Amino acid sequence: MKYLQFLAAVAAVSAFSGPVLAGSSVENTNQVLPVQLTGALFSQVANGQHAERAIKVDNSAQFVPVQGTIAALSAVLNEQKAGKRSFSVENTNQVLPIDVIIAGLSQVLTEQKAAKRDNIVKNTNQILPIEATIAALSAIANGQKAATKRSTAVDNSSQFIPIQGTLAAFSNVLNSQKATKRNTGKVVDNTNQVVPIQGTLAALSTVLNEQKASKRGVDVDNSSQTLPIEATIAALSTIANGQQAGKRNAPDFDVVKNSNQVLPIQATAALLSQIANGQSVEKRNAPDFDVVKNSNQVLPIQATAALLSQIANGQSVEKRNAPDFDVVKNSNQVLPIQATAALLSQIANGQSVEKRNAPDFDVVKNSNQVLPIQATAALLSQIANGQSVEKRNAPDFDSVKNSNQVVPIQATAALLSAVKNLQSVERNAPDFDSVKNSNQVVPIQATAALLSQIANGQSVEKRNAPDFDSVKNSNQVVPIQGTAALLSVVGNGQSVSKRHEGENNIVDNTNQVIPIQATIAALSTLLNSQKAERSYSVDNTNQVLPIEATLAAFSSVLNSQKAERSYSVENDNEVVPVDLVAAALSQVANGQKVTRRGETKESIKHNVNQVAPAQASLSALSDIVNSAHSRRAMDVKQYETLQYAINALQQALDKTNTGDKTHHVDAMTGTAEHFDERDAGLDPAAFLGSAASGISVPVGNKDLLKSLVKRYAAEEDEAMAKRTPSLNGRGQRPRPRNSSSSEHNNNGQCSVGEAKCCSQVITDEGKKKTLAGLLGFNNLVGDIGLNCQQIPVLGVSLQSICKATPVCCTNVSQDGLVNVGCTSIPIN
């Protein structure tokens, strides 16, 4: 899989990557390994995210994180859409995360929508997208509305309410996201809820942030509602941070009394001085039960201080055991708490929590409540922020006593000085009589922001549940989010991936992963849009759609994300590497590509999953485009594999939204649209196709390039003249034979690239970097050939044909003036 490493190569000042690995020999394992690291200075910014999944069960687990971002001195529009459909599958999991983001001196509009439907599955699991962002120096309004969902013919209905909130700019900015979920099954006695989260903004003027959520259940014994949450903060600059957590139970079980909960967390602080904000969560097992020993409790904690003076904000959590039950003694309570205030003038921040017991049941007397958390404000004027969450008991069950709750999470920090924000969550489920099931959630978050440096990291570890007697089931969700911002523009995004491993037909369970979003902006224009669509018709499908979008600072900016998946079932193997780069006043490049390969075995020929590759575009104050790919010397097989991926991208240009099982998506149209406006004589499709393969890129300063080539060529000739003279009096150019860096083929053949006869070959690292910078390359493998001509025939007559230096070059630019990625050809 070396070509994956190549596809993940990025162009910018620095790069960050970290592997996310999952085991392959466990019957049932659910991991969530989100990784996020973001730093921002006035010079450099790095942002990366990784996602990996391994699966070998009859169940499908999808993960579709989305990240989008923009900023500019002019109008910017950023849209992301993700759609996924499943046909003829017993169990289907869809994820429709969406995110988008903005900032600029003019109006910006961004919308996100997420919808999911399940038509053939008894039980449906969904995941809520998240949105969070920013603030400005003028008035900012942020509203969130939650969609209404009704269930008509099911004993129990599963709904969730989307979230919206956030905008920022020197003028008006609107950012919204919607999510709806419907459950059409009629045989499910189980309830799954997911609570979305929203957090955002502040300014020097009045800021209003509201969220409303309503849900109704029709013709159902019980109605499950979920109320979203909103939290915000503000400083003198732009700050946005949001994170969401959701977890849902697998389909109905015959003899399983199981309960799965997810911990919400909230922490936040802001002020002109240092602020420390931490929160921890602990879960205790409920008392012993007669029939089922199952109890899930969550005790989140929040503390925050902020102000030019001292501010102390604490929150306490109490948990009460549910009443005695006739058949099942099971109690699930979650009592989160949040409170916080900070500002030079008046700040009001309140949150209330109420818990109500569900109505009496004939068979099961069970009560499940979820109490949301929220609180936080900071600003030179007034800020009000509140969030509430309510959840009611699931209906009666004939054979299953089960209840699932999900609590959202939000955390944010910002200030002109140091800011630190930590949050941890840990939960262990008790032992069960008939089912040994354990659910752990260990999210971690840390964030700091200064006037110069910003570091944001998050790690998540998940442990495998113990062996099960009758059901091997384990569901974990670990959302995390943390973020910080400078006096200038800083964005932070993070994604979460979840993996499920197990033998086929052992688990009929579904695992979900929570996407996370954050965002950014720069002094120049950035447009980043990404689309993803999937279609499949197999019993099991695994997709990973990581997306990352960009940022820009006063200097170079690097932003990359990678996603890798591998699993050992008769399923398609996809690779979704993503890369994008953005630069500041001089260079801005943003690109991301997604390639995917389907297995060709006869038994799974019908299983072809395509991932709509992401689109990223560029636009800067100078005419420089930076290709995010650089070739490396590779063998024939590797080259063919790479070329296959490149061809797949190019073929997708004219196949958009076909809607068939082998779904093709236009990979580069969005980018190509913008080249027509900037370069009238440029063929966008041809340019992007070439740039994708790293063959040629336009040069911002051609005169400077030609001048340097002329000078370097003269210096190389002068150095050659000082070497051992040849018969014609000129220096004899070296011709290495079978060196470690040369092509290992007989008769001077090139396994990769084209054979060139170059008058000069630049090996000096300093000169190579200078030329590479002008060409738009950041990472080069091999040397650079100058004044080269193609060699028509290789082999025995090579010496007579090429009087200069024969090389194999993988990248050609500027009509042979400069050839990149050159390696010497051994002459026999």
Swiss-Prot record:
One of its GO terms (cellular component) is fungal-type cell wall. Residues 1-22 form the signal peptide. Filamentous ascomycetes and basidiomycetes generally contain multiple hydrophobin genes. In contrast, hydrophobin genes are absent in the genomes of the yeasts Cryptococcus neoformans, Saccharomyces cerevisiae, Schizosaccharomyces pombe, Kluyveromyces lactis and Yarrowia lipolytica, and the dimorphic fungus Candida albicans. These organisms have probably lost their hydrophobin genes during evolution. Mycosarcoma maydis does have hydrophobin genes but the encoded proteins have been functionally replaced, at least partially, by the repellents. It is found in: Secreted; Secreted, Cell wall. Disulfide bonds join C750-C808, C757-C802, C758-C788, C809-C822. Disruption phenotype: Does not significantly affect surface hydrophobicity. Leads to complete loss of pathogenicity when rsp1 is also deleted. Self-assembles to form functional amyloid fibrils called rodlets. Self-assembly into fibrillar rodlets occurs spontaneously at hydrophobic:hydrophilic interfaces and the rodlets further associate laterally to form amphipathic monolayers. Glycans are attached at N156, N222, N738, N811. Hum3 is an atypical hydrophobin that consists in a repetitive repellent-like region that spans 578 aa which is separated from a hydrophobin-like domain by a spacer region containing three possible kex2 processing sites. The repetitive region contains 17 amphipathic repeats of 31-36 aa each of them with a C-terminal putative kex2 processing motif. This is Class I hydrophobin hum3. Aerial growth, conidiation, and dispersal of filamentous fungi in the environment rely upon a capability of their secreting small amphipathic proteins called hydrophobins (HPBs) with low sequence identity. Class I can self-assemble into an outermost layer of rodlet bundles on aerial cell surfaces, conferring cellular hydrophobicity that supports fungal growth, development and dispersal; whereas Class II form highly ordered films at water-air interfaces through intermolecular interactions but contribute nothing to the rodlet structure. It comes from the Eukaryota. Keywords: Cell wall, Cell wall biogenesis/degradation, Cleavage on pair of basic residues, Disulfide bond, Glycoprotein, Secreted, Signal. GO terms for molecular function: structural constituent of cell wall. Pfam families: Hydrophobin. The keyword GTP-binding does not apply. In the C-terminal section; belongs to the fungal hydrophobin family. InterPro entries: Hydrophobin.
